[in-house]
Each structure stands twice: as structure tokens, then as C-alpha cells.
């Protein structure tokens, strides 16, 4: 019986918890924007909306967590458990993506850019504010704002790392 419990504990440590945390991070990347959109539903308790009590309780608990962290980081939009899951995934990835000391230089060069981009993007999720990207159009001379494009990869890269495609000025 003890052997079965030890095997189950080892299975959980090696496979279950890292994959669960990775799933939490992947599923919660869109969570802060959806919480901000649903705050007006929670603020009207007598409305005839289809929000259940469990959803309203979970939203108010995350609002409490956000209020707790508001005095530490006033412009930080990721709640505590999202931050904890991202940090744990960064820790797991940093150990998983490190190459052994006996590896060839060619293998190290192939692995290095991918692992650095992955860790840098997760670190940027922790340290940078979430802002919508602004596109400056050289033809119109005004700033255009795109609030609906939450899940487009180009907009996401422009938001997180300032990466954009094409030349800066058209000549």
C-alpha cells in the first residue's frame, strides 16, 4: 500500500502538477480582460442576468485579491494566483530548457533562442503593464486604437515586446 502511494506521489510531482500549472497559465492569459468586462454585471445585484452565485463569488474574491495588491502595484492587472502560476511555469521551464554541460555547441545554439523567447515572454507577462497597443498611422496623422483585438498574435507581440512588422517609415 505504501508503495502505491509513493508511486502516485511521484507521478503527481513529475507529471500532474507541472501540466496543471501550465494549463492554468494557458487558460488564464485572457482572464484579466474578461474580469474587467464582467465587473459591471457583478455591480448590479438585482439585475436579471444569468450570472450564478458561484461566478459572482469567484469574481468578488479575485477583486479582493486585486485590491490587496493595489497598494503594492497600482497598475498591475494580473491577480495573485495568475502571477504564482506564471512564476511556477517559468521555474519549470527554466529547468526543463537548460541544456546539459556535455551538449554540442550546435544543439545549444538551436535551443537557445526558443527558450529565451519563451522565458522572456512569460517574464514580460509578470513585469509589464497590460495596455492596448496604439498604432500610429503616418498617413492620417492621428492615433488609432484597437480594443477588440485581444487574441491576434501580431497585436499581442506589439503589446508585450514592442515588435511590429514592416518599416517604421514608408519612403
UniProtKB/Swiss-Prot annotation:
Keyword list, A-Z: Cytoplasm, Periplasm, Signal
Signal peptide start-end: 1-30
Gene Ontology molecular function terms on file: translation regulator activity
Location(s) in or outside the cell: Cytoplasm, Cytosol; Periplasm
GO CC aspect terms: cytosol; periplasmic space
InterPro entries, sorted: SecM (IPR009502)
Primary location: cytoplasm
Family named by the database record: Belongs to the SecM family.
Purpose: Regulates secA expression by translational coupling of the secM secA operon. Translational pausing at a specific Pro residue 5 residues before the end of the protein may allow disruption of a mRNA repressor helix that normally suppresses secA translation initiation.
Protein name, as recorded: Secretion monitor
Source organism per UniProt: Pectobacterium atrosepticum (strain SCRI 1043 / ATCC BAA-672)
Lineage of the species this protein comes from: Bacteria, Pseudomonadati, Pseudomonadota, Gammaproteobacteria, Enterobacterales
Amino acid at each position: 500500500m505504501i508503495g502505491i502511494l509513493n508511486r502516485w506521489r511521484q507521478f503527481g510531482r513529475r507529471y500532474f502538477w507541472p501540466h496543471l500549472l501550465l494549463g492554468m497559465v494557458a487558460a488564464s492569459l485572457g482572464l484579466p480582460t474578461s474580469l474587467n468586462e464582467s465587473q459591471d454585471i457583478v455591480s448590479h445585484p438585482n439585475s436579471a442576468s444569468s450570472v450564478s452565485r458561484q461566478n459572482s463569488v469567484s469574481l468578488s474574491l479575485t477583486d479582493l485579491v486585486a485590491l490587496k495588491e493595489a497598494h503594492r502595484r497600482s497598475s498591475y492587472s494580473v491577480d495573485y494566483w495568475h502571477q504564482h502560476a506564471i512564476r511556477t511555469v517559468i521555474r519549470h521551464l527554466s529547468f526543463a530548457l537548460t541544456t546539459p554541460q556535455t551538449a554540442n555547441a550546435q544543439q545549444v545554439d538551436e535551443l537557445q533562442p526558443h527558450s529565451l523567447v519563451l522565458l522572456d515572454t512569460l517574464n514580460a507577462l509578470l513585469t509589464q503593464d497590460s495596455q492596448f497597443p496604439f498604432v500610429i498611422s503616418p498617413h492620417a496623422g492621428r492615433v488609432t486604437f484597437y480594443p477588440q483585438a485581444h487574441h491576434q498574435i501580431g497585436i499581442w507581440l506589439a503589446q508585450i515586446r514592442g515588435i511590429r512588422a514592416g518599416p517604421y517609415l514608408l519612403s
